[in-house]
């Protein structure tokens, strides 16, 4: 397989950013993010016959979209905790693959890196790298794969998916039809000079491997049935609680990882476990904010399970449900931004403390299910597949398996040693494809 790079440049907004918008203050919630790049990959099986026109339209509409999301084309100033919206641009690459898309998909999963390979120079070779980068990959069959990377400092998955849908709409019907983003978090929750939170642990020298596993609808139905049977001696109230598919898959994966931990130590008893999830706070508080506010606006959910011997799936879903329910109940009463900031900081402190201490199993998850990633339509239909890429630490991403249905695709990023055990776990193999 050969990959030809046809274009590599910094793409700037189509018109300059006005002087009064050239500094965007970051919020406290932006400030505390680990500044890594989140990757998104959108597969489109068939485009129009003229790929040159398609690529030109994608480029021009992206440049127009950057006039609304002007901060994305700027640079991060960590000293002042602002984005300097100076129109330096985002990374932009066009490539051509000499194979058909279905052949590419049959290859090794590491090929995902090929879909972003042209962006690596942008993101690593400069002192002030772009905050985002896009790579357009054309295939012999007329298929297109769009790879996107966003620095987490500029926003969460809600913000990233909104940007992609805005770009798609600009390409499909014109920039005038695209809603302007709102930036209301920093005035309410300004950045701080001193954060007083422990740093995340260092994983220098650890090789992480990323693999994709799919729980289709049938597998989730089977998993729910098994969990019910497993808890056959539980009380009636617990049986009435129906965990979400995200909680169910999270609990199953955590159970598998706990069993791996026991096997690694040749013990029947595991350490206590902490399941960590991220919860979108939009529409959950009483703060005077737009429902589609851009930036990072989520809280860390720390769900602890103290059961150290053969935990059941229902034990773990109960821990998740209890932790999530408590936060939902608390934030629903809050109309003070300082209280929200304090809650978020405390959740991050607890997570980083336990993550670094090493006395508990810490399983880090994030769910992108129900985010409109499968609605990113540039004019030739929705993507047939949406995926993500590896990150430099242990993380399990849960995504919708397909445009419709209740299946879940899992992108697991684990250490090389743990991944070998994980993908051979007998129960996991009975559910995933």
From Swiss-Prot:
It comes from the Eukaryota. GO terms for molecular function: acetyl-coenzyme A:acetyl alcohol acetyltransferase activity. The N-terminus is blocked. Pfam families: Transferase (PF02458). Keywords: Acyltransferase, Transferase. The active site is at residues 152, 377. It catalyses: benzyl alcohol + acetyl-CoA = benzyl acetate + CoA; (E)-cinnamyl alcohol + acetyl-CoA = (E)-cinnamyl acetate + CoA. Its EC number is 2.3.1.224. InterPro entries: CAT-like_dom_sf (IPR023213). It is an enzyme of class 2 (transferase). Expressed in petals, style, sepals and stamens. Very low expression in stigma and not detected in leaves. The keyword Nuclease does not apply. Belongs to the plant acyltransferase family. Involved in the biosynthesis of benzyl acetate, a major constituent of the floral scent. Can use benzylalcohol, cinnamylalcohol, 3-cis-hexene-1-ol or heptanol as substrates. Has some activity with 2-phenylethanol and 2-naphtalene-ethanol, but no activity with linalool, 2-hydroxybenzylalcohol, 3-hydroxybenzylalcohol or 4-hydroxybenzylalcohol. This is Acetyl-CoA-benzylalcohol acetyltransferase. The lineage of its organism: Eukaryota, Viridiplantae, Streptophyta, Embryophyta, Tracheophyta.
């Amino acid at each position: 397989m050969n990959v030809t790079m046809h274009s590599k440049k910094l793409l700037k907004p189509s018109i300059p950013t006005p002087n009064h918008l050239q500094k965007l203050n970051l919020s406290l919630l932006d400030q505390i993010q680990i500044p890594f790049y989140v990757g998104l990959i959108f597969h489109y099986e068939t485009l129009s016959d003229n790929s040159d026109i398609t690529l030109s339209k994608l480029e021009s509409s992206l440049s127009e979209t950057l006039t609304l999301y002007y901060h994305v084309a700027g640079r991060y100033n960590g000293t002042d905790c602002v984005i300097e919206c100076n129109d330096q641009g985002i990374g932009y690459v066009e490539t051509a693959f000499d194979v058909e898309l279905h052949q590419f998909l049959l290859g090794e999963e590491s090929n995902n890196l090929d879909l972003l390979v042209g962006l690596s120079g942008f993101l690593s070779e400069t002192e002030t790298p772009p905050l985002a980068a896009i790579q357009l990959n054309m295939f012999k069959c007329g298929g297109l794969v769009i790879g996107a990377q966003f620095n987490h400092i500029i926003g969460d998955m809600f913000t990233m998916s909104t940007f992609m849908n805005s770009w798609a709409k600009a390409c499909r019907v014109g920039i005038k039809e695209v809603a302007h983003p709102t930036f209301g978090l920093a005035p309410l929750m300004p950045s701080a000079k001193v954060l007083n939170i422990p740093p995340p642990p260092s994983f220098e020298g650890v090789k992480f491997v990323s693999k994709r596993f799919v729980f289709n609808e049938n597998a989730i139905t089977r998993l729910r049935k098994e969990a019910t049977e497993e808890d056959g001696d539980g009380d009636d109230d617990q049986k009435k609680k129906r965990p979400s598919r995200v909680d169910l898959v999270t609990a199953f994966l955590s159970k598998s990882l706990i069993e791996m931990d026991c096997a690694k130590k040749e013990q029947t008893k595991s350490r206590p476990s902490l399941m960590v999830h991220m919860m979108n706070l939009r529409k959950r508080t009483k703060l005077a904010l737009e429902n589609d506010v851009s930036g990072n606006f989520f809280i860390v959910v720390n769900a602890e399970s103290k059961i150290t011997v053969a935990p059941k799936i229902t034990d773990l879903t109960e821990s998740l449900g209890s932790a999530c329910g408590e936060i939902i109940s608390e934030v629903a009463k809050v109309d003070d931004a300082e209280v929200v900031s304090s809650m978020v900081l405390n959740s991050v402190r607890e997570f980083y403390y336990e993550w670094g201490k090493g006395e508990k199993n810490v399983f880090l998850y994030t769910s992108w299910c129900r985010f409109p990633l499968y609605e990113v339509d540039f004019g030739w239909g929705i993507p047939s597949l949406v995926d993500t890429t590896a990150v430099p630490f242990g993380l399990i991403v849960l995504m919708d398996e397909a445009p419709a249905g209740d299946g879940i695709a899992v992108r697991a990023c684990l250490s090389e040693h743990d991944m070998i055990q994980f993908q051979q776990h007998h129960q996991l193999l009975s559910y995933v494809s």
